[in-house]
Design a protein with these regions (language model features):
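Conserved catalytic-core segment of NTP-binding enzymes
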Residues: 1-103, 112
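Generic structural signal for well-ordered, non-membrane alpha-helical segments
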Residues: 86, 126-129, 133
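C-terminal boundary of histidine-terminating zinc-finger modules
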Residues: 116-127
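C-terminal alpha-helix
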Residues: 132-142
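Active-site donor-binding loop signature of nucleotide-sugar glycosyltransferases
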Residues: 106
Length: 142
């Protein structure tokens, strides 16, 4: 029932919007069951752990095996201490064959905004997170 509902709603929306963002849990249920239409861009998001990057790599490989091949697939690494990936994580990104779209630094202000119910779009213009996200959007050409 839920899968059919998601599929129906996405189909209704796709003719009205230039972009549709579908946030999946760490898995491929919506893709493997054919619920979502073909997408142009698949953005995999991981924390900065090696295991998280490995999971993103497995999802990218599964997408390929299911013949679900977006025009572009990339990785965003989120909540990175000081905004700097360590050598082990960078090595794992290379090992997984993932394109790094960007790194979003850890920021306590994002946590506080969430606690206060404020959208992160209201972060100050000089916020490192806002700057990182704007860079990723620019890199994607959105």
């Amino acid at each position: 029932f839920v899968n059919g509902l998601v599929q129906t709603q996405v189909q209704k929306l796709q003719s009205h919007y230039p972009y549709i963002v579908v946030d999946n849990e760490a898995g491929m249920e919506h893709i493997s069951r054919g619920i979502l239409p073909m997408m142009e861009v698949a953005i995999l998001v991981s924390d900065c752990s090696r295991r998280g990057v490995q999971a993103a790599g497995r999802i990218a490989k599964l997408m390929n095996e299911l013949n679900f091949k977006p025009q572009k697939t990339g990785l965003i690494v989120n909540r990175v201490p000081d905004g700097k990936l360590d050598a082990g994580t960078l090595e794992e990104i290379r090992n997984q064959g993932l394109e790094l779209l960007g790194v979003v630094p850890h920021d306590d202000q994002v946590y506080q905004y969430d606690c206060d119910g404020k959208p992160i779009i209201q972060l100050p213009k000089d916020s490192p997170v806002r700057s990182a996200l704007e860079g990723i959007v620019k890199k994607l050409g959105l």
